[in-house]
């Protein structure tokens, strides 16, 4: 709970903003003293679906749109532009969109005896896994197409990000018809075999190749993501074991 500080003074609502703010009425309070509220109450919702339902009922003032609620809230036209569905507009809900520069990734434990280290064997395993995990498919299924597959740690809009062929991850992608194209899974399977695991088994012992994933995720939405990820590893005959941690 945040309450008004009786000793705060001297700040007013801005009179300038982004293009379109004035037309949207966001600058109507120009010059008025802040804050406008006496108290702000914040609560934490652990699950996305209950949070979304409470937002629709008016318990929350703002909400992001999860993949589970995307079709209910947003429609996409043939040009790729997004707009609220009629149901959302009737509730008086407004859609605010922006381009967010951020990066999320899954990392390898470089101390792991199987996929860690800088030996040619472990390096090829990491490369094979990177090719096999189809990030384009992940974005399409779980993020409703909102995002692009990373080519480096730098997202678009950050200084140093390179566009075009010179900016692609050539280990995972080829440059085809003016855009990056993920290498076929056959390349990943070949790398696994070159690492000493033909058909996903150690060529010396015959033991299956097992990779552990430590994750803090939970809930129904997370299970579907982990099931999808398990299938990605299975494409190159690698067994993925998910280990939940605190």
Predicted features along the sequence, with ranges:
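Gly/Pro-rich hinge or "lid" segments in bacterial periplasmic/extracellular proteins
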Residues: 1-41, 49-50, 185-186, 190
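Sec-exported extracytoplasmic/periplasmic mature domains
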Residues: 7, 56-60, 113, 125, ...
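Surface-exposed intrinsically disordered loops and tails
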Residues: 14-35, 76-86, 90, 119-120, ...
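Ligand/substrate-recognition segments at binding pockets and active sites
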Residues: 15, 32-34, 42-51, 180-185, ...
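Extracellular/periplasmic solute-recognition and catalytic clefts
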Residues: 19, 28-30, 41-112, 136, ...
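Stable alpha-helical elements in mature extracytoplasmic
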Residues: 48-51, 66-70, 104, 121, ...
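Structural transition elements
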Residues: 115-116, 148-197, 215-225
